[in-house]
Amino acid sequence: FATIVSCIDSRTSAELIFDQGLGDIFSIRIAGNIINNDILGSMEYSCEIAGSKIITVLGHTKCGAIISACNQINRGHLTGLLEKIRPAIELEVETGGMRNGENLSFVANVSRLNVVNMLHQIREQSSILATLEREGKIMIIGALYDIDSGAVSFFTP
């Protein structure tokens, strides 16, 4: 019934966070919960072919990929992945203090903005998913999981 794009961080298992068993949801995991063509194809399959009714992009606090992007880490293939997070860093203007991975308020805000950016990318890059959403056949929403409290905040930008 649901497709969840979440991070590879072991603390962010969608099955555990949402109390779902194996086979209950489509779980797509990638560092920084970023979107690429393979992930879009997986979401299109889960919704158009398998009948999933909701896509949730699930970010989380204290995300190592977000922290690495905030710290401008450049290493191998990781560099390209972190570049997809950079627009969220540039959009974050609310947090005072250091604009790096040591400022956890900054990191949390970037995590939320990254989810918002990924939601926009889904709608812009997949005409299939955008059409299904426009027709009311699926919902595309964002969520942020707080590692410390276990709370999940849902939102639609």
State each model region's role.
Residues 8-11, 61-65:
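Gly/Ser/Thr-rich loops at beta-strand to alpha-helix junctions
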Residues 4, 28, 57, 142, ...:
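Divalent metal-coordination and catalytic microenvironments
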